[in-house]
UniProtKB/Swiss-Prot annotation:
UniProt keyword annotation of Nucleus present: no
InterPro entries: Ribosomal_bL12, Ribosomal_bL12_C, Ribosomal_bL12_C/ClpS-like, Ribosomal_bL12_oligo, Ribosomal_bL12_oligo_N_sf
Record field: transmembrane: none
Encoding gene (name): rplL
Taxonomy, superkingdom: Bacteria
Organism from which the protein derives: Magnetococcus marinus (strain ATCC BAA-1437 / JCM 17883 / MC-1)
GO biological process: translation
Task performed by this protein: Forms part of the ribosomal stalk which helps the ribosome interact with GTP-bound translation factors. Is thus essential for accurate translation.
Entry protein name: Large ribosomal subunit protein bL12
SUPFAM superfamilies the record matches: ClpS-like, Ribosomal protein L7/12, oligomerisation (N-terminal) domain
Length: 123
């Protein structure tokens, strides 16, 4: 069977038949069809592809800046921590303020902390 004949046969298959073919090939050769697609996307898109796929983000306080008291107040408001815990978190920067939050929430927290004078990263 030539390549053209194989391509022609694949073109005439239904989606269900193609899905079954892929599963059979994965089992036969011990591979995953998803891996090559992910590698190709990462090569082409680089950092943007990783960002789009990520759904949970960590808000990291990199530095309190020169308005430490305002930053402590903002951290207490966001996290519900007591004064001592919030102060320890701010003084121990870089530290995670919140982990595994949505992109929208991470952006809001970052804006609020930066408004208070902090340097913030989202990872």
């Amino acid at each position: 069977m030539t390549q053209e004949e194989m391509i022609s046969a694949i073109e005439s298959m239904t989606v269900l038949e193609l899905s079954e073919l892929v599963k059979a090939l994965e089992e036969k050769f011990g591979v995953s069809a998803a891996a090559p697609v992910a590698v190709a996307a990462a090569v082409g898109g680089g950092e943007a592809v990783v960002e789009e796929a990520k759904t949970e983000f960590d808000v990291i306080l990199a530095s309190a800046g020169d308005k430490k008291i305002h930053v402590i107040k903002a951290v207490r408001e966001m996290t519900g921590l007591g004064l001592k815990e919030a102060k320890d978190l701010v003084e121990g920067a870089p530290k995670a303020v919140k982990e595994a939050v949505s992109k929208d929430e991470a952006d809001k927290l970052k804006a609020k902390l930066e408004e208070a004078g902090a340097v913030v990263e989202i990872k």
